[in-house]
């Protein structure tokens, strides 16, 4: 483990090491100038997004995408109690409270647009690595292993003001948040709203579920999506080779 965690948190789930080691990529792959991480449930639909990520991390910046954009009807979950009283249920706030980083910091994260760590780019010598590692160590003291690396990067950006190049939503298109459309003429997935830019990286985070089955695991699953000609077709959102 790059950061020691109690055995009871691991509970024989050795794969959780990957949740920590992601913040130490240059240690494991030292001979590269730039690093682009793409989760295993994501795939490249348009190569231009890859070039954008490599450009985004110039001069030590973090290249990453916020999970907010046209068509998002809700950005944070809130349970309203009575009048103005409410319980904040945003992903950042929930993880921050669980990790006991302090309410002052948790409040700064509460309504900040969540940053998904499934796709990002960094230069080898960026100070972002050490900042991320520092915040990850803090988050792991009380929080769960799974999700701590995401909380740590949100802390680095929104609390420590890590210099960040925010890329368009289509550079990390989370399908469970908003389904794409399909351009049948060009045979490519596109954004559902004008001007219907190409999806850069399709990310099946949280899964696409049908009849209790997850498309990430079951290659046979297809769902109904719209085309640019307003037709409805059955389509898999997986990479098809």
Tell me what each language-model feature is.
Residues 1-241:
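Glycosyltransferase catalytic domains, chiefly GT-A lineage
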């Amino acid at each position: 483990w790059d950061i020691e965690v109690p055995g009871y948190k691991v509970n024989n789930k050795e794969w959780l090491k990957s949740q920590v080691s992601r913040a130490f990529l240059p240690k494991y792959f030292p001979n590269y100038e730039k690093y682009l991480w793409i989760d295993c449930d994501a795939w490249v639909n348009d190569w231009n997004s890859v070039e954008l990520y490599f450009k985004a991390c110039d001069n030590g910046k973090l290249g990453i995408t916020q999970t907010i954009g046209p068509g998002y009807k809700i950005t944070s979950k809130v349970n309203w109690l009575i009048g103005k009283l409410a319980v904040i249920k945003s992903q950042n706030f929930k993880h921050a409270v669980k990790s006991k980083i302090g309410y002052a910091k948790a409040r700064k994260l509460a309504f900040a647009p969540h940053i998904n760590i499934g796709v990002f780019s960094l230069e080898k010598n960026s100070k972002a690595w050490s900042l991320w590692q520092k915040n990850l160590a803090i988050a792991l003291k009380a929080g769960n292993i799974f999700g701590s690396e995401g909380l740590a990067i949100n802390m680095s950006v929104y609390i420590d003001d890590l210099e960040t190049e925010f890329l368009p939503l289509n550079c990390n298109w989370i399908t469970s948040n908003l389904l794409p459309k399909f351009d049948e003429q060009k045979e490519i997935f596109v954004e559902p709203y004008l001007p219907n830019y190409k999806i850069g990286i399709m990310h099946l985070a949280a899964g696409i579920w049908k009849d209790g089955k997850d498309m990430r695991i079951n290659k046979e699953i297809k769902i109904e999506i719209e085309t640019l000609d307003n037709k409805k077709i059955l389509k898999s959102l997986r990479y098809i080779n």
